[in-house]
């Protein structure tokens, strides 16, 4: 999945004509060097494109208008090399609907103490030019990010890369289509929500399809295509005897391959990048889609069980953010606890649908086993564990007057004991700051039982994503205390009531 190849961020230098052509030419010469260096040496996920210098209100407004309508542009990165009076930016910023990053840098890293004169001071005015630009952003109550540091600094590179990933995720959010196969699991509350409000807030659309619409595509899959896909399975995974050729569950595997091919075609034909299923809506399917869902997630699709469209969309967004990074991202559910002094653990899993991108094993085990829910034939699934390391769980919930993005930082651990009778993929973690505090804070905040689990994407990216969309962000980590957490929720309640 290469979602960044066709994207670009526009690098924009603001100034004014009173500096004269010689100074302005030096500004652009420096800008060319900065952009070329960032593109070639900073490891950025998205290409920077240097735009012509803007020195008038009309030029700025025209550039912002062009950015809005250019589908390749996912955001604007500004640098105030000199002083650019910020009233010139009001018209452009008032219509800009792409993410905005102010790179508060300067061409020279250190002050040339021996030679610095007023010409040098006149040219290198980021220190106060950036403050003028920052004021108008604050005055207009506009969300924009600020990164301070020299353009050759590795930390600045890393933060710019993070911002680019989130900007790309916002672009994806605005064009994302989510398909729901069936409806919500009956009587479940947290997987419901206002889909119209979500489309207004995030841009993505959510529409339901009768299971018969999917079944028609599944039934049209040819035997030849099934055989080809099963050959891919055999090359990619370890098989139990039951699913090998002539095994007693081989037919179930073939049915699973048919379902995968049908689901893939349905999603591709409709332009969907996320979807949900529901074990209560399976009429016409021989088994609950398990293997199909796992493999589609690994290809970058978002997924939510039991009709959970918010988690499906969020998973797709994190898949985009994490493209090319080490570690995977998966649909997840807190399933059961290990209460043990000094070793409290959470086992995360689901009935079947855990993404192999988080698998520790190079070749997960493919098996068919009984599933005592859904009333269908035994489904195929991939079974694996998850490597140790830092991770997070994220949940997007509808609070009625706002959306809340809740994140818990966790530490994934190696599976401490064999699980010979557990026929599903799983991750095991220690919640920060402790199981007790994390669980209580999560429950108090109304966090869902479904989450997006990621070992690729970090807290900073998710906080920035929430800021870009103007939604609430709550973090549970090693610094969390319940009294402070409860107070934050109370303060947020007041803020979002006043900010409606």
From Swiss-Prot:
Q: Which UniProt keywords apply?
A: Arabinose catabolism, Carbohydrate metabolism, Isomerase, Manganese, Metal-binding
- Might you give the EC number(s) for this enzyme? 5.3.1.4
Keyword Metal-binding on entry: yes
Catalytic activity line of the entry:
beta-L-arabinopyranose = L-ribulose
Report the InterPro entries cross-referenced here. Ara_Isoase_C, AraA_central, AraA_N, AraA_N_sf, Fuc/Ara_isomerase_C, Fucose_isomerase_N/cen_sf, Lara_isomerase
Q: Which residues form the signal peptide?
A: none
- Taxonomy, superkingdom: Bacteria
**A Pfam family per the record:** AraA_central
Assembly and binders: Homohexamer.
Protein source organism: Yersinia pseudotuberculosis serotype IB (strain PB1/+)
GO molecular function terms here? L-arabinose isomerase activity; manganese ion binding
An example GO biological process term is: L-arabinose catabolic process to xylulose 5-phosphate
Q: What does this protein do?
A: Catalyzes the conversion of L-arabinose to L-ribulose.
Q: List cofactor names only.
A: Mn(2+)
Mind telling me which PANTHER family this protein's record contains? L-ARABINOSE ISOMERASE
- Top enzyme class: isomerase
Classification via NCBIfam families: PRK02929.1
An annotated GO cellular component of this protein is:
cytosol
Q: Which residues bind Mn(2+)?
A: 306, 333, 350, 450
| Family membership noted in the UniProt record | Belongs to the arabinose isomerase family.
Cofactor comment text: Binds 1 Mn(2+) ion per subunit.
CDD domains reported in the protein's UniProt record: L-arabinose_isomerase
- SUPFAM superfamilies, from UniProt? FucI/AraA C-terminal domain-like (SSF50443), FucI/AraA N-terminal and middle domains (SSF53743)
The name of this protein is L-arabinose isomerase
Pathway(s) served: Carbohydrate degradation; L-arabinose degradation via L-ribulose; D-xylulose 5-phosphate from L-arabinose (bacterial route): step 1/3
